Amino acid sequence: MLRGASTTPLQDKRAFLPKRKLTELTGLIGNTPLLGVAFWGPLTQSRREQILACAEPEAFEKEVQGLVAELKTSHTGFRHAGMRNIPARHAISATTQCIAVNGGERWMFQDVHQGGPAYSAGIRPGDLLLDSGGREIRPPEDLTFAVGERVDLKIERLHGGQERARLQLPVPKSQKHPVTAPDPVHAEILSDQIGLLKVAMFPGVVGIDVAKDIDRGIASLNGCSRLIVDLRGNTGGGIGGLRLMSYLTPGKLEVGYSLTRKRRERGYRKEELTRFGRIPSRKATLFWLAARYAFVEKSILVVTEGLGNRRFHGHVVLLVNEHTASAGEMVAAFAEENNLATIVGTKTPGRLLSGNAFKVGHGYILGLPVAGYLTWQGRMLENNGIVPAVAEGLSRDALREGRDTQLEKAANVARHL
């Protein structure tokens, strides 16, 4: 404990984490592909007194979160295992966009995934958020939740009128990754032989279940000569995106690779990295898979599965937006680099690293990046993102008319491929 520090539970918690645990975690930061201990040590020291001065747990968490945010990378975070302050995209399966309304700013619901709490409560794209639990929320304040709670949101509907939407938030299976999974895959046939495959996320580390969902979605679009893959609002997940990428090309193609700091400094040839090129069909094989990769260096090369020719090959459009992140960006970058699809929408955020969550004591969890990700052509998407070949935003006025301008643009592009 720090000399002279109080022995109250909160003071003990504050002293324990900043001095002992956060200092120990400089070793974990050493695996970060972008920054190292030389950066983290002085920064921790400079913020220490601010952290120790916090009188309440919420302020303490906010200060440590601010410290971790100085890394300026994705897959960072600091929170309590009680799962407070979970962002809307993870808690209610919905994203928001800041728009101008009557001389001010409001959050507009943008991607509202089927099967998620927001969708089940009747919230739809274009609705405006007015308050949460009676407290007004405006940009730049983010909409966050505590999992398991019942929440009342005041909504201004797209077509006018105000209502209260009552959401019941489930308790996620994982405390380390508190994400409420919506229906991950939706498929439908649009006009002109265009199939639509919407993938909201890639749940699961290996992604056996979502891979099967993608299989069923593609099978239901049999006969379509053109395909739109809608990745808007896809916040990522595990390696299940490999199945989607494998449907975009007939053979086996290198996608990209994770790269730890240790491997980068030691030197490497990307062709010699350990390969991952098949999502198993049965969960019984997960034990074998875990044993195979448990003791290898965590720099892994991803290769498509070789699923054969599809009628829509060469006629694919990928829809992305500013919420398409992580594994969603991996899919988009692969399609772009190999000329497998035309990218339509808005620029992605550039949040693509391999991360892990570490328990640091007193119920707190620290999220840190542990490996970088590079495409096969050597691009790092972190903090860069993907710029669509065809730019198209989402219009609330068009939504009011029953039109999704981004989907309309994607369909028009698909017809001319």
Locations of regions flagged by a protein language model:
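C-terminal regions of proteins
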Residues: 356-394
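Extended, small/polar residue-biased N-terminal targeting/export presequences
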Residues: 33-105, 150, 158-184, 417
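Second-shell loop/turn segments in exported
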Residues: 8-15, 30-35, 47-56, 114-117, ...
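PDZ/PDZ-like domain segments forming the peptide/carboxylate-binding groove
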Residues: 85-139, 196, 210
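Low-complexity, Gly/Ser/Thr/Pro-rich intrinsically disordered linker/tail segments
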Residues: 388-417
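Extracytoplasmic/secreted envelope proteins and their assembly/folding machinery
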Residues: 19-29, 41-44, 48, 57, ...
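Conserved PDZ fold ligand-binding element
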Residues: 25, 118-140, 228-230, 335, ...
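Cleft-lining beta-strand/loop regions that shape enzyme active-site pockets
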Residues: 6, 148-150, 154-361, 399, ...
